[in-house]
């Protein structure tokens, strides 16, 4: 099939989609407002004059490119068109007079954008209702999005490469009893963007409480990621007196993220908002037990009580207690970790998830008309 993605070419998730479908023998074109190269795929870059991190007002410049998008699609004549992110690329697709196309919602386009104003809400409704087929990475996000459209969603989770994300990255470690008697650190952490919605401040405060209430615990905190609150969080760690046990790893690529998760005794994802818990899925694939906050997108990505421990969001004390209990119980860490990998490999393995999307494409490709 000829598949055309209308999505940011420099985004990791876009690239993952392109690589998988290219490797299946499909011809891939990407229409993007950001520059980027994707091996084996054709990227049609449109300079909209708005940066990827520009304001909503700046990104209105995307919309005047609808005619250009139409022209490119008309030239490609794809069998499948899939726009990604409802309130930028999805809106352009809605204005471009395209054949029936798919729209994949991502997260902030559903959870944050429509709450800014009535105009933002109407823009999202317009985008959702113009698409022929709607895709969501989670049931939780589909439920949230259903406030803005009566159209049904097909659930297409973000898949994880279970060969890359694997306990084999650090064979033989982690399942001994972690305490000061054997001199090994208790390594906890997360791999997330450093912004308020992901609960990084809660994680820092919980770590400080754990250290204060149980000074015998040899805890080491690892945080991988970049983001707008980075300086604020580093200052908070210093204020809390945990800067000497906190390792700020910065942005790391997927290969290093797999190693980071596999090397942890416990993964922490205390998000306050999450469309789908990709980080929790990656951690579980590495046999790393996880503690998550009680938000639907994270709970859907785990099996609470079987592969994860759930604590209330924004509650550092409850998180600190869960971290301590996980430290004390090596058997529980082992059982959660083993169950987590089994769950992910059976439910969210990369090929399983993309094969489902491919089958959806095949089923509807015959309905896609030429421009």
Name each model-derived stretch:
Residues 272:
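Aromatic "clamp/platform" in nucleotide-sugar-dependent glycosyltransferases that forms part
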Residues 4, 181-207, 222:
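Conserved donor-binding/catalytic core segment of Leloir-type glycosyltransferases
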Residues 234-252:
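Nucleotide-activated donor-binding/catalytic signature segment of Leloir-type glycosyltransferases, i.e.
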Residues 304-305, 309-316, 325-330:
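Conserved acidic donor-binding segment of nucleotide-sugar-dependent glycosyltransferases
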Residues 289-292:
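Short hydrophobic beta-strand element within catalytic cores of glycosyltransferases
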Residues 103, 124-171, 176:
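Donor nucleotide-sugar binding/catalytic pocket of nucleotide-sugar-dependent glycosyltransferases
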Residues 73, 128, 251-252, 259-264:
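Short alpha-helical donor nucleotide-sugar binding micro-motif in glycosyltransferases
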Residues 1-42:
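N-terminal subdomain of nucleotide-sugar transferases
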